[in-house]
Amino acid sequence: MIIKNVGFIGLGAMGSVMAPLIVKAGYNVFGYDIHINIAKSSGIKQIFNIKEFTNLDVIIFMLPNGKIVADVTDELLKNNVTSILIDMSSSDPRDTKELGQKLKIKDIKFLDAPVSGGVSRAKIGELMIMAGGHEDHIEIVQKLLSVMGKVQFAGPLGSGHAIKALNNYVSAAGLIASFEALATAISFGIKPENFLKIINGATGKNNTTEVKLDKFVISEKFNSGFALDLMVKDVSIADSLIKDLSADKPLSENVSSYLSKSLEKLGVNPDHTEVYKVLKKTT
């Protein structure tokens, strides 16, 4: 199958930088977002009505959650869409599997391919793409997805979304531990720069200590570009999966609860690195 025409639904922070990469790779891209006017300079052909999404080889979703993906899919099915559907959103894997059963009956290929890396890596096409679904179907869209990053097969449908949630849980646990350690070190009288040099040369280093502490926390800029409410959503999904499937679950509920409480305290649309402000007050 030769893929030429690609629909992209959801052109927010991530979608708006991912879709232009597909254009640059030579595909015809048709974009739809109820909140955004697409710049003509992007090369994306804006679609104003979901009913116009016809005769496309692939349709990609980059939406807030799986429930919205399911609703949009229902609208597409009313138009007898036969495109390959790819959910690159951070959806609940259980919703993904449920939608997959519905689409399988209609003989529509459906994959989940959530991403990790944030806006900065999305801009340069270096996302980690976690692909779930039938391997033959993933092979069909491998070249297309590779335009946006490295494609890693995760497993059956829903596996990509499961790993995405679990990855963000592990990242969040490291974030809270790193913030707690930094605040404690400063209270003890240790300079932040000394703390970072030693932690990042020792076994405690992680993504937060290497990438976030100096640039966003110690600098007090708190502008990483990843909203706390998105982290809360992903960690909540992971916590729910862990409760359902794990024999022992000593940490996930505490991480999820702490992030949710921090979101309540921080107000409107905080960056996820602002959790440090909450933790600092209680250290």
What label would you give each PLM region?
Residues I9, A13, V17-L21, A113, ...:
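N-terminal glycine-rich phosphate-binding loop for ADP-containing cofactors
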Residues L63, S90-Y169:
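Rossmann-fold dinucleotide-binding core
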Residues I50-I108:
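Rossmann-fold NAD(P) dinucleotide-binding segment
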Residues K102, M128-G160, A172-N207, L245-A247:
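Internal alpha-helical scaffold of NAD(P)-dependent oxidoreductase catalytic cores
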Residues V29, Q46, F110-L111, Q152, ...:
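Hydrophobic beta-strand scaffold residues
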Residues L157, V211-H272:
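Interdomain hinge/lid region at the active-site interface
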Residues M1-K51, Q152:
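NAD(P)+-binding Rossmann beta1-loop-alpha1 motif at the extreme N-terminus of oxidoreductases
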